[in-house]
Amino acid sequence: MTVDYYYNVGGFIFSVSLPQGVDAGSLLPSFNPFRCEAVQPEQCLFRITAQEHPQVPSVLDGDLLDESVNDLGYTSLFAVSDGYRVEIRHTSRAAIHHLQADSRFTSAVATVFWEDCHAGSVLCSMIRIVYSQAVLLHGAISIHASVVSHSGYAYLFMGKSGTGKSTHAALWIKYIPGTELLNDDNPVVRIQDGTAWVYGTPWSGKTPCYKNQGFPVGGMVRLRQAAATAFLPRQDIEAFVLLLPGCSAIRQDKILYGALCSTLVQLAEKVPVALLYCRPDQEAATLCFTMLANKKIDD
């Protein structure tokens, strides 16, 4: 027997079905601020069912599309006849857990070995994978970024791992009164009624910041480490190129990737986008704030 739990992340409702006796609150603590009332199945973006008695399929077929080691763990993505299959293990020697999803990530089955001490982290990663692909067809994107809010707007800082996204966000909080952290790793951005909004999610990297809040986007900035600080506004294709890295989409899937690109084109048109060469200091934070929050980006 299973129990259904419902969550609302970024305005998208989804359900997670867990075996009776598995406590969602303790297994997925970062999801607690996003719990919501049950809705009809057709109102859910997707549904994930975690098997009560996990059994690995006897035949593990599929074409390998990607392998990576990141904050999700060790992951392998396969294309199969009816969708996608994902293998996840928390460490190199941990048990391999499996996720099977349809081609549009509206339904998925999770094979999680509950005796694994990392089962909660693995299931959290599985939900993140499904969510990041499911939202693409609804004008939304899961983005690797750190986000702060100030005076009713939110500002996203993007960049390669180790660039200093979290550090730059912390500098805003330290030197710009009224700034608060919204999410430190994986917010969701969506277009609503012609306006770009960004929302907190249950996925915030190493920083436990799980806020069920959303703000209009005041700007999106890609950071690059440099000896001198320079703020360079970007528009059109240059803005698109800055935003694309760090967005979650299966590049080999023409429909999902096409939806991503379509939304990015809108973002590039609707919000200020810039490249910030910077050091991790007050000058960089102050300049970025001045140019974005005060709307001083040149045409």
Model regions and ranges:
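Conserved glycine(s) of the Walker
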Residues: 164
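Hydrophobic positions on the alpha1 helix immediately C-terminal to the Walker A/P-loop
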Residues: 168
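A noncatalytic interaction/capping subdomain that flanks phosphate/NTP-handling catalytic cores
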Residues: 1-156, 161, 171-180, 188-299
